[in-house]
Regions:
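Proline-threonine-serine-rich low-complexity tracts
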Residues: 1-197
Length: 197
């Protein structure tokens, strides 16, 4: 009896489990044998590797009437899914006294700078919310990547608008002028006094 094992196979990660299962089942059927009397080919089978990565080692055996069983071993491997790397936006600070529209635009553009790599079928989301008030405030945003082969990855970044400087109003000192000046003089002094605020 001669037995021919399947070639060792390596499949890429990020396929569906159904795809891996089908390829594994098809791979099992590629084992062959020749010779022997009433030979029967079996395999230890088992489950296909996880689609996120792993190896199944299979023993193929031919039993026949006139010889001891013949065996061979082959492996079916799924490469490990690439690790998710989440890149958070840098914390951002904007000055106050811009329009709310301008702050909203900058906030949305900032949200879009988050990125990720790796993983299988990853989706990037964020807790978003509203931009800070253009007069001052901070919005803290959680960014999350969910994927098929890892627990969710998260990071947090902040977008801040610096609080406006409080207004300090300095009134002119109360003024008293003597009578009997011309109206032009009084008008001039009054206007000058207004300008001291």
């Amino acid at each position: 009896v001669s037995i021919t094992c399947p070639s060792n196979v390596t499949e890429a990660a990020c396929q569906t489990q159904a795809q891996i299962d089908t390829k594994f089942s098809n791979w099992l059927t590629t084992a062959t044998f020749g010779g022997g009397c009433n030979g029967v080919l079996t395999n230890s089978g088992g489950a296909a590797p996880n689609h996120c990565g792993g190896t199944s080692s299979v023993t193929f055996t031919v039993t026949s009437d006139c010889e001891a069983p013949k065996t061979c071993v082959a492996t079916f491997t799924v490469t490990n899914a690439p690790v998710v790397v989440l890149n958070c936006p840098s914390n951002a600070t904007e000055v106050a006294c811009q329009s709310q529209t301008s702050i909203n635009t900058k906030f949305n553009n900032w949200l879009a700078t988050a990125s990720f790599s790796g993983g299988c079928n990853g989706i990037l989301t964020n807790s978003g919310g509203a931009a800070p008030d253009h007069c001052g405030g901070t919005t803290s945003v959680t960014f999350t990547v969910t994927s098929d082969c890892e627990a969710p990855k998260t990071c947090v970044a902040t977008f801040t608008v610096i609080d406006d400087v409080p207004i300090v109003l300095n009134c002119p000192s109360n003024a008293t002028e003597a009578a009997c000046q011309t109206q032009a003089q009084i008008n001039s002094k009054f206007n000058n006094w207004l300008g001291t605020a």
